[in-house]
Amino acid sequence: MVNQFATALRSRKPIGASFEFGLAPDSNINRATDSATLDTIIAPLDLSRDARQTSGLGVRAAGQAYLRAPLAKDLSFLPRVSGQGVLYRHSAFNDVSASAQLGLEWSPGRERIRPSAGASFRWYGGQLYARTATATIDWQHPLDGKSQLGAALTAGTTDYRLNHLQDGMLWNASIAYERAFDARSGGGITLVGTRQTARDPGYATVSGGVDLLYWREFGKTSAFVTLGGRRLEGDARLFLFPDRRREWTLSAGGGATLRALAWHGFAPLVRVEFERNWSTVGLYDYRRVAGTFGITRAF
């Protein structure tokens, strides 16, 4: 859905949106460890059942929309909104987020430059978990008829409502290269770096990673595979734990949109993803397999 929305946003359409709805089975809905106890500097810590790995079947809905309103030659007003949520029978694991951005799009020649400011909110278990205010600038530059380069810089402030020791600044930078291999296939590579500060240096982190994407059209079926890797380092150790956070994360996924079975523009969607996080702090060490089986549509 994100790729559908990004494609529409890169076009000159004055309005665009995408929507997704489906069932979402997940082996680890809370991205938690499967260990019953954790080692601490005092004594082994027993974890409650809801603090450990929990599987579940959720209902997932997500949507995004934008409006492009011309202000002058090569300049448009560009508001964007998005939201997504996964709801479970056990509401303590419900995960909902929403964001809104107001910005401009400047299009000198073939370039696209978009400065924007916005806010995002996340609710977990029915409670406001975090809110973030951000300022972003992204740039897109076609290299030739088959490839393009993109870059983005974001600065923001984060406010964690349940633990203010995590509050701090958020900095993110990314650069992406996309290429069409032929009329029916293509791919891309994205490099990402993130810095997050916090009142407690144990929650402050720096991370970097790479994401790979390959997509291909098979008749009226759009298929894709993804692969990603990420490294994270904590500034200091968290209270109770003997080591500071040092993590490797591996993610992989694949899916397909079956347009041959579309009904009134809504097409079946199948997506499967795998995630494994190795951490020196047992609380963050987990594995996860999840899927989405639903419908999607881009407008």
Predicted regions and their residues:
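Gram-negative and organellar
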Residues: 1-299
